[in-house]
Amino acid sequence: MNNLRLNSNRKIKIAHVITGIGGGAGENTLFTIEGLDKEKYHINLVMGKELKEDISRRIRNKRINFFQIQPFKSRYHFLCDTILLLKLIILFRKGHYDIVHTHMTKPGILGRLAARIAGVPIIIHGLHANALEVSDSKFINIVKIFLEKKISKFTDAYISVSEIVSQKYLEYGIGKKAKYFTIRSGMELNKFTNARKNIDIRQECQEFGINGEDFVIGNVGRLVLSKGHHFLFQAIKRILEIRKNQPIKLLIIGEGKDKEKLSKYAKELNLEKNVIFTGYREDVEKLMALMDIFVLTSLREGLPRVLVQAAAVGIPAIAFNIDGVSEIIKDNYNGFLVIPRNVEQLTNKIIKYMDNKELILLHGQKGREFVQGKWSIDSMVKKTNQIYHDLIEEKITKEMK
């Protein structure tokens, strides 16, 4: 342990460790790093994946220090993970960090273990989703839970995006309740709130071959099987079987390793004319402005940012009732909650909106009202800073005894 290093006038050194900057976890991490006081903190970003050009430009413009460490593979691999662990230990020792703040599963396990071995005084883990039961392998899930229990003994705090996610971890006996803090994700919502005012709807529709008769359904997220796109495709297929002449367009916004599989599956269901893969888009709010409803079929989420963004645009949402979803979607108030994997129920809820445009407007308005003022980036940064401050004070007090 690096005793008393915190009790000085120099800047507090923090390392944020994450697989890559993409999706909600990465966005939260960047907002936090950007918002923290640079006169008080010296912050480094440690990650494995290569950066997209827009993210790289953003990091350079904000003068964020970052280290890219390989091999940072998503899947568990003993040799690669051992090498990564050793590299992190060396990095933390050389950097003399006061706080290591990890995010996501593998960086959370290896990063905290490395921080412990390197003698980092304060170790924090960010919970962006319930990652304990997501693998198809029961053995891997059991190992993750076992490791999380062990590592919890030297984890000083858990910062969760959702009360429900915290509760899941506590139910498995991971850490003590006093170590858990819930901080809502911070988001830039103005561009979503004003999306329908600031774009030429007709021009955007032309880009994707959407006409005025089409009922437009949207989905935003990584194109990976855990996002459950195939359930949504199956629901669209059923609707077209029930209503053969129903004009439907499904906008799938995002990129991911399973894009080819999903594209192939859409073709197998004869949905080529209905499903539009837009690829990665920086202007998500413009595409959301074209949608009648938003559908999220993820099988795991922490607190889905896209549902908040859709609500800010004024779009009602249908979502599988998992983890933090119910903290945003109130059933039959600003959207509908559906039993996970239940295609029949999903189909029925989509049809319910198709048959009732007034309900779309009502739920859309309720959604906008619900999210207003609750997802402040400034609030997220201030609460994170307070946790850092309290842990530092606590550590100094213990070292002085």
PLM segments and residue spans:
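Aromatic "clamp/platform" in nucleotide-sugar-dependent glycosyltransferases that forms part
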Residues: 280, 299
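A short helix/loop element that forms part of the nucleotide-sugar donor recognition site in Leloir-type
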Residues: 54-57, 193-210, 216
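Short hydrophobic beta-strand element within catalytic cores of glycosyltransferases
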Residues: 316-319, 329
